[in-house]
């Protein structure tokens, strides 16, 4: 493995960690409605679990209400049940062939709990990025040991990887700060 391959691998894997964080943060409910909140809710469809977005049209009615329009009318009850049983704390209302999902206002205590969850997700992402840095540095040390690169090249590559790590950690901090602000906004 060359220095460029090690750097590229670290960069790709760090980007995946960042993407995972973004997905995890999008699942955390804020006071506002957004269609992405139902993305990970699974509904039983002909014996197999599928995301709600594949069996229904999910739209925003207003800042606090989501409308779910099933493609097949009989699916309405199953979708309503799946949303109610999800860990999101939502209480969907059936309107015949469609479902309204009002977003309850978050209490101050719930907001604080959610910010702790957000910080935890951010810390997990930072740990993942730092572990990737460590793996990349170990790979570089192995190249030096096998006399494939000089110690100067190793130091330069380690500096590159450190800059990459710093950039990703800064991006993680930015995402966490944005999400916390979103949660704490009443």
From Swiss-Prot:
InterPro entries: Ribosome_recyc_fac, Ribosome_recyc_fac_dom, RRF_sf
Keywords, sorted A to Z: Cytoplasm, Protein biosynthesis
Cellular compartments per GO CC: cytosol
GO BP terms in the entry: cytoplasmic translational termination
Pfam families named in the record: RRF
GO MF terms, alphabetically ordered: ribosomal large subunit binding
Subcellular localization: Cytoplasm
Domain of life: Bacteria
Function text: Responsible for the release of ribosomes from messenger RNA at the termination of protein biosynthesis. May increase the efficiency of translation by recycling ribosomes from one round of translation to another.
Membership in a protein family: Belongs to the RRF family.
Protein name per UniProt: Ribosome-recycling factor
Organism per entry: Bordetella petrii (strain ATCC BAA-461 / DSM 12804 / CCUG 43448)
